[in-house]
Amino acid sequence: MKKLTVAISAVAASVLMAMSAQAAEIYNKDSNKLDLYGKVNAKHYFSSNDADDGDTTYARLGFKGETQINDQLTGFGQWEYEFKGNRAESQGSSKDKTRLAFAGLKFGDYGSIDYGRNYGVAYDIGAWTDVLPEFGGDTWTQTDVFMTQRATGVATYRNNDFFGLVDGLNFAAQYQGKNDRSDFDNYTEGNGDGFGFSATYEYEGFGIGATYAKSDRTDTQVNAGKVLPEVFASGKNAEVWAAGLKYDANNIYLATTYSETQNMTVFADHFVANKAQNFEAVAQYQFDFGLRPSVAYLQSKGKDLGVWGDQDLVKYVDVGATYYFNKNMSTFVDYKINLLDKNDFTKALGVSTDDIVAVGLVYQF
């Protein structure tokens, strides 16, 4: 707690930061366009939990390209990579990672189709509340956990404005091929064949949306549940459905999502809940002078966890703010107030119950 108090006092003496920046156009000729974008996020966590305390600096670099094939057909691609800045040179680049890598074709008002490493369709709704200065988006949208966040081997069809007939009405369909990861360290990131859908409608700042996805689970995932059903889901299929509401106008941003998952949600890094009920809500206001305060509440409750019964997996209030110096430079502070109680469940499975304060300075282009 002493570290948290020091962190908050230090941050209170400084102002906070970050605004959406445009990518740098590096080529635009003969119907071919290439944009380069990137960011450096120099940040530090303060927490009584050693695993969540320390430097978490990283840099990201990516490009977006497109080529006009004819009046109705456009090709496009995107790649994004993350470089860790908190490792010694002797540790190499083992923690660096490819975030996005996909290519596709857009057929005018008939939509687009792409394939590669991209965002899962369930994140079309999850993204609405994943807007906090540092934390958030962690009750059910998890990277490489089926189609809830960034995912490997997804083929995606997207249609905006419903074939050009209804402004603001968008829908998507997605298929994910099997990725069999059998090592215990990454078995939660494996998946069988799966499909998903999403639909959103936005009008004058108001938005409503829903998503559904279902996938086969790998043999490793199913067998783990047969051995230890208290902490490993044993179902053969993973499912998620989610719905969301948002308002984004007049400098105000409000959003909330509710979702339920089956045999999908990961907790304490390695374990999978049989069922989880998840709720997220966020409110933000953008002042004209650059300050954007943020407050949020997030909760994920695991259901039917064997001898553990029903348990909170994630539960916290988040209070933070970002200050934008300009479109390229910003600073932030984010305070995650952990509401999980220390009990037999959290102690046995290593679920953190400590608060975290994050402080950062961001340059992006």
Swiss-Prot record:
Residues 1-23 form the signal peptide. GO terms for biological process: monoatomic ion transmembrane transport. GO terms for molecular function: porin activity. One of its GO terms (cellular component) is cell outer membrane. It holds the Pfam family Porin_1. Keywords: Cell outer membrane, Ion transport, Membrane, Porin, Signal, Transmembrane, Transmembrane beta strand, Transport. InterPro entries: Gram-neg_bact_OMP, Gram_neg_porin_domain, Porin_dom_sf, Porin_gammaproteobac, Porin_Gram-ve, Porin_Gram-ve_CS. It is a multi-pass membrane protein. Its main location: membrane. It is found in: Cell outer membrane. SUPFAM superfamilies: Porins. Homotrimer. PANTHER family: OUTER MEMBRANE PORIN F-RELATED (PTHR34501:SF2), PROTEIN YDDL-RELATED (PTHR34501). Belongs to the Gram-negative porin family. Encoded by the cryptic lambdoid prophage DLP12. This is Putative outer membrane porin protein NmpC. It comes from Escherichia coli (strain K12). The gene is nmpC.
